[in-house]
């Protein structure tokens, strides 16, 4: 009996001495970091979800070393509040320098923001996307060229990048491999959602306000080459995310574009001649319906890029049954035949299985 007691006590001691899980992340209070920022939204008579469909699409953030001191700085975008630029002081402390560097922008409905060395001078510049209601003040994208002393010069018009559409985000990449950065500009259409939209042929009709665009860097100015490059720019492209990666292993950058609502996503393979081929239906068997964003990485360490897409699948069965659209078989097949592909309300992970035998075409399985 006594031996049983000692055995039980030993087991209890071993269990109680189990190694605690290590903490991977610790929340730092903004009172200590100095990162004081809130993107609050307020309804007005002229600006609300009924007058501006993308009211709740949110804003962006960019991180980069703007003054080349080895510390990453943070730019936080605001919709109805001003953008904020925080200078990294070291030891996770930041200083708001927005006004002193001339980047205050309250009321201009900023969406995405990117940091990139646009003019090749070794300094990160800022490209700030704008959206908002049609009568919104100063609704054009802004390009802030870094002057090297934590001051910036707005030169969007000089560079041909003062777009006045419904910009969501911009990604910088060298699609033609000529040594400078080009731009894919993602937009989210302001067009209302309706069942009449599900018909063929709309993808080829360009929309100057809500359509995506590709800009080629020609040195001191950018040229819109969307049409000649084969980039869709219609009103049904409700873009929310764009990702750059070499998807077929030819050492040229390709694109994956996430579209919300009924429009399918786009997968562009680089043709190495300044143009792209949009080939998603041939390569991906099924995709997310209301795609939010995508990321591309080698998830299984087989050296091949996999694609993960997030979706708007509700968290509870009640919302799934009340919010998810259901279609009969004939209507579903008609949508597929009209070019909208096989779409489902859930996240999707496209695993890269390699190449089709004897071809340079990759195979993905969901």
Named regions from a protein language model:
Residues 17-366:
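Acidic, glycine/proline-rich Ca2+-coordinating loop motifs
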């Amino acid at each position: 009996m006594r031996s049983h007691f000692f055995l039980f006590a030993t087991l209890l001691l071993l269990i109680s001495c189990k190694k605690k899980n290590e903490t991977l992340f610790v929340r730092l209070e903004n009172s200590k970091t100095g990162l004081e920022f809130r993107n609050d939204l307020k309804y007005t008579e002229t600006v609300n979800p009924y007058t501006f469909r993308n009211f709740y699409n949110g804003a962006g953030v960019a991180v980069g070393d703007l003054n080349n001191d080895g510390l990453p700085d943070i730019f936080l975008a605001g919709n109805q509040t001003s953008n904020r630029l925080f200078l990294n002081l070291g030891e996770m402390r930041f200083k708001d320098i927005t006004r002193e560097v001339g980047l205050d922008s309250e009321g201009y409905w900023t969406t995405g923001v990117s940091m990139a060395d646009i003019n090749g001078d070794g300094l990160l510049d800022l490209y700030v996307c704008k959206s908002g209601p049609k009568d919104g003040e100063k609704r054009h994208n802004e390009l802030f060229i870094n002057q090297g002393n934590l001051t910036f010069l707005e030169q969007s018009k000089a560079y041909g990048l003062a777009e006045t559409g419904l910009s969501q985000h911009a990604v910088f990449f060298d699609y033609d491999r000529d040594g400078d950065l080009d731009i894919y500009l993602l937009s989210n259409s302001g067009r209302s959602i309706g069942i009449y939209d599900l018909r063929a042929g709309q993808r080829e009709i360009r929309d100057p306000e809500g359509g995506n665009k590709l800009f080629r860097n020609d040195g001191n100015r950018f040229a819109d080459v969307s049409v000649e490059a084969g980039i869709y720019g219609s009103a049904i492209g409700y873009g929310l995310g764009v990702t750059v990666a070499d998807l077929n292993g030819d050492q040229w950058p390709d694109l994956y574009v996430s579209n919300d609502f009924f429009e399918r996503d786009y997968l562009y393979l680089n043709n190495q001649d300044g143009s792209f081929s949009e080939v998603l239906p041939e390569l991906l068997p099924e995709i997310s319906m209301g795609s939010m964003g995508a990321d591309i990485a080698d998830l299984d360490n087989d050296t091949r890029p996999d694609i993960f897409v997030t979706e708007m699948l509700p968290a509870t069965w009640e919302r799934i049954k009340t919010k998810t659209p259901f279609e009969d078989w004939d209507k579903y097949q008609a949508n597929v035949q009209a070019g909208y592909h096989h779409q489902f309300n859930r996240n999707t992970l496209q695993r890269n299985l390699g190449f089709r035998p004897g071809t340079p075409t990759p195979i993905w399985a969901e």
